[in-house]
Amino acid sequence: MRLPIRAVTPETESAEIVGWVHEVRDLGGLSFFLIRDRTGIIQVTIPKKKVPAEILDTARSVSRESVVRVRGTVKAIEKAPGGREIVPEELEIISTAESPLPLDVAEKVSAEMDTRLDSRFLDARKPRVRAIFFIRSAVTCAATAFLASRGCINIATPKIVAAATEGGTELFPIAYFEKEAFMNQSPQLYKQMMMAAGFEAVFEIGPIFRAEEHNTVRHLNEATSLDVEVSFADHNDVMELLEDLIVHVYDHVAKDCSEHLAELEIDLKVPSKPFPRIPYAEAIEIANKTIEEKLAFGDDLSPAAERAIGDTVGQHYFIVDWPTDIRPYYAMPYPDRPEFCKAFDLMHPRMELSSGAQRIHDHDLLVERISAKGLSPESFEFYLKPFRYGMPPHAGWGLGIERLVMTMLDLPNIREAVLFPRDRHRLMP
């Protein structure tokens, strides 16, 4: 019976393993293979004078990244990976890999990002790359468990829609029989509708689509968003929920993914609560102290401004009290100063991670705000209808999973945090 490589210890007497040939070395009287599965790497040592001829013949024909089965005696060897090796009694090539390889899984020869993504299945065999996606999986599992523990219902909303969430042109049109349709930018409208349904607290982890022409290290055209909406809550309530989630996820990864963090050479620090709350006007002042292209009140924050503020704050933080005119139509204005709204962004020192707000729950005010944005309320009738039949006060946010993983692991490019990225220039594989 096959053992995962991690389960083979120096105390194991014999073992059968199956995995990929990571490296092949020939030192005259000895041949060495490094065999890899998703749990680790083990050395297979072939003393040429002590193994059957058929094993030697098979060993000579093995190419890197071929899949092999090895059964043999385990010996404790201090200098070998994991302090043990296998001397084979059986060696079988299950699947042969062509040579040369499109890229070097052992990473002795580096590869450009495009080369890596063109052969992502092979790139993902690298222990370092695999560690990123084990951690990403841990992030989403921890977030799901945390939100369920807070009473949130996991929902699934349409990704093919008839209207834009926020208007604008950042839409992917698709052929949908005789109708006009688009890929959804956000589950925003649907999660608000579930507040009218009485679900009270919901979340979704799913894809979002933005037809942005950005081609940067932090933008994707298809991304994964963690969205939350809570009834009978204001912006402060959901900011607290968001920072609790961030701290919980970091803590979970630090405790449960130590091996993968070590592979990435990361000493993960868990953020401290509460995160600072910085008013938008103050954030502009902080940024303008150091950036060359100064911002005026009412401007959105540039990447340079985000970095400048992040350098000053040095930790996760919220930007709050945004000008109403530059936030989505559904953001609730302050009653006593309607030029500002109850919106916020969660920031990492490197970039924005999340955006949220208390939402408008009054039908007439919402229609007024939609019109003020130059949009047609008639186009949003399906969304507005629930607001006529008892919509509770509510608030929520959306959090980018790729950006969360990217900043957590200090990755240089957001494409490192998604298996098969979709950007302006990449549609395959």
Curated annotation (Swiss-Prot):
One of its GO terms (molecular function) is ATP binding. Mg(2+) 3 binds at residue 352. It catalyses: tRNA(Asx) + L-aspartate + ATP = L-aspartyl-tRNA(Asx) + AMP + diphosphate. GO terms for cellular component: aminoacyl-tRNA synthetase multienzyme complex; cytosol. Its cofactor is Mg(2+). L-aspartate binds at residues 166, 210, 355, 359. PROSITE patterns: AA_TRNA_LIGASE_II (PS50862). Its EC number is 6.1.1.23. Pfam families: tRNA-synt_2, tRNA_anti-codon. Mg(2+) 2 binds at residues 352, 355. The record marks 81 as: Important for tRNA non-discrimination. Aspartyl-tRNA synthetase with relaxed tRNA specificity since it is able to aspartylate not only its cognate tRNA(Asp) but also tRNA(Asn). Reaction proceeds in two steps: L-aspartate is first activated by ATP to form Asp-AMP and then transferred to the acceptor end of tRNA(Asp/Asn). This is Aspartate--tRNA(Asp/Asn) ligase. The lineage of its organism: Archaea, Methanobacteriati, Methanobacteriota, Stenosarchaea group, Methanomicrobia.
